[in-house]
Design a protein with these regions (language model features):
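Basic, amphipathic DNA-recognition helix from helix-turn-helix-like DNA-binding domains
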Residues: 1-15
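Intrinsically disordered, low-complexity protein-interaction/activation regions
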Residues: 4-7, 86-88, 105-107
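Short boundary/linker motifs that mark transitions into or out of structured domains
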Residues: 13-27, 107
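Positively charged, aromatic-enriched patches within helix-turn-helix-type DNA-binding elements
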Residues: 25-92, 97
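Minor-groove-contacting beta-hairpin "wing" of winged helix-turn-helix DNA-binding domains
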Residues: 99-104
């Protein structure tokens, strides 16, 4: 398939509300502001943007972003969600007690 076709471009850009992630350029924008994200933060927000409104367990996020190297009892997911919350202006990531987190897909 031609990389310049609309379908190919749609797959390369994820957007929820005013947050846009360009997979080709590896850039995340919130409105007209570029977010300065680490590799792990980028992987985490990509996971949220691929599953808006869906509750993602800590284990699933840990496995996707960090692989199998980390202790499931680690709070690394919570720490990085905290980093993302500080960088995203607004209440985008909701805590679902006892399960994990979800990206709010509407205001």
């Amino acid at each position: 398939r031609d990389a310049s076709s609309p379908k190919a471009n749609e797959e390369m850009v994820l957007q929820v509300r005013d947050v846009t992630l360009d997979l080709r350029k590896r850039v995340v924008m919130q409105g007209d502001r570029t977010l300065d994200l680490s590799v792990r933060e980028f992987a985490l927000i990509e996971m949220f943007l691929r599953h808006p409104g869906q509750v993602l367990s800590r284990d699933r996020l840990l496995e996707h972003v960090w692989g199998y190297d980390y202790d499931p009892g680690s709070n690394i997911v919570d720490v990085y969600v905290g980093y993302l919350r500080k960088k995203l202006k607004g209440d985008y990531i909701e805590t679902v007690r006892g399960i994990g987190y979800k990206l709010r897909s509407n205001r």
